[in-house]
Amino acid sequence: MSSAKGDKLAPRPPSYGSNQSATPTYSLPPHPSTTYPQRHQSPASHAAASTLAALASSPPASSSTASPHPPNVLPTPSSASTSYNARPSTTSTLNQSLYSSSASPAAKAATAGISPSGSPLRKEVHMSSTKQTPAASTSTLAKPASSSTTGTPTPSSASKESGSSKRKKATRACLHCQKAHLTCDDSRPCQRCVKKGLAESCMDGRRKKAKYLLDDDELEELRRQKEAKKAAKQAVQQKNAPSPQQRQSRPSQQDSAKSTPQNSDPSSEKASAVSSILDQVAGSIATPSSSGHGPSPHAHDYLSSNPFDSSNGGVDDTQASSNNGGALPFDLSFDPSTHNFGSEATSLEYSILSSMLNGTDLQLMGASGASPDLQASPAVGVMNGWNIASGELDAILNISMQQNQVPGAGGMDTVAATYSDTADMGVYADPQPNTGLQDVGGGDSALNALEVPSSQCTAKEEPILLSSGSGNGNGNGSGSGSGEAQQAGSNNQVDLGSSSQRSTSNEPVAADINRAIASRRVARQQQDTIWRARIAKTYRDNTAPFPYPEGYHFLIKYVTSKYEKQDVLRIVRALAIFRPSLIALQMPLTEEDEIFVERSFQRTMLEFEKLISFSGTPTVVWRRTCEICVVGAEFCMLTQWSKDQLMGRRIYEFMDKNSTLDYWENFAQHAFENTTQSVMTTCTLVKPDGKLVPCAWSFTIKRDIFDLPSLVVGNFLPILS
């Protein structure tokens, strides 16, 4: 059997030429029954051992592809049964050949002139494994290359080293690889830039330095660069912003464009829609004409929708809108360039929304008392849109009314009444024969532009006109408009109408609006003054520590006179739970500490008063000894007790017996508990007439800076069912 196996394992020597000397050798430790001379006398056995070493060092073949058998080696039955992995069967066969002491004469004759280091069987196995799995052969031959006697690297190891050098991460990536977040190499130009055709611009990328690592000079340079970029951006925006001449020329271009038919292109329709809106903007900011009676070049943008008519004194809304060509009823004085959104469409949309929310509705202007000359003169009281995004009053319409304007019916009174709370402004009408409007800019001066008249305003003051014409009392002559405008800049007086031309039906409206604005401002100022005085009084008065022990003495007297002995014992037990901790925390406190705690308590009460005034829930705030300090108006309505009757008394005086007992037991349990300081339960309140009000309520225990229970906030809701 051993001779037959030797015949099967006898290799057929191929001709390799000069490549035979460059092939690395393999070796196995000798079997205990085989000596070194015996291995030299059996080349076939040594070739099988070399093949076994090669197979043992190579990874197993995948399950999907069966590894082929070496040449001249027939598969055994065990290998045929497991064709998906022929390595175990081949190994067993080679082990039998390796440690077999006999070999056939044919095998000895075939391998007589071949040295063990240059076995053709091992070379054929190597070639077959290389053809099957190149990656496996590379990993197999890479190991003996390092331990070979010649020391010459194989091509597979050279390719591996070159591949690993390509995948090696560079110390600093080039600019293009850094932007693309790809792995670069140390060569310049790098391989990726060469492939992409970017070899000329391949350079080391700049690493952004952290701000905390920058020096003072670098920080200053960075700040200057940011300022320069910001200035350049503003310059570009100002350069791209249309000038007043261009804005005035847009309506004429629009009229000429409307007269010629255009293609129904979506982009052209969108551009025309935007241009039409911008034309309305241009009309809103146009300056008044130089003539005393003539309207401004774009005054029709506002006045065409005005429901005034010279013949019948007024028209309906549909007719006014049809005469205007579908103009919107609100003010469209907006400029997209004032909003820095980076997109013209976004800025335009924001400007439109701001104008819709804050503009003036021209349909609110009355029609009584209008003269035929009103249609030919710009309307005073029409206000441009308020630029809320910029936080300033961008513009107030500087078109002065020459004749016949009703102050109460104008849009300015309505807008001033609407924005009186936020902008702290108002309007008034001075009984003077002429009218005018001051040009108001943004900033602090804009907030004081429209003021409520004081008693110092007399009828001796001369009117101020901003228009370039119509300076006399009748409005028919021409005056020095520029000098009067400069005088208007020095005075904060606004004249909105002529007493001889006012409509008597609108005088009460203007007077009521002015009185309401003035009273609201005065009330707000009084509240602020009282609030500041109360805060100052808290820190200025000689505050004494609050006598808390008297509160507990009053509690014992109250429950002894009202409740039975068992109920009194329940309250005493509740007090015994938390009073020792309370006394222990108060022991190290000095008198100054107690004064500080009392001032903090009084200052906190002021904040609770403000908070409760904003809430609609019946709320009461009391001390830890139940003295009521703050009462909400809703609690007074719920219990029918007045605020004066509640202040200074104890909260348990307005509860029934069971509610009082439950409150003290819950307070004793949660007074010094850190997990839960709020309790939700039910109670029953007592009205002055003795009726009971069942309520669901919650109380929260607040502590001071020394971790003492300082106050309790109670919220009550009546149970209606």
Swiss-Prot record:
Residues 1-172, 196-331, 464-509 are annotated as: Disordered. Residues 174-202 bind DNA. This is Transcription activator of gluconeogenesis ERT1. Residues 470-482 have a biased composition (Gly residues). Its main location: nucleus. InterPro entries: ERT1_acuK_gluconeogen_tf, PAS, PAS-like_dom_sf, PAS_13, Zn2-C6_fun-type_DNA-bd_sf, Zn2Cys6_DnaBD. It comes from the Eukaryota. Belongs to the ERT1/acuK family. GO terms for cellular component: nucleus.
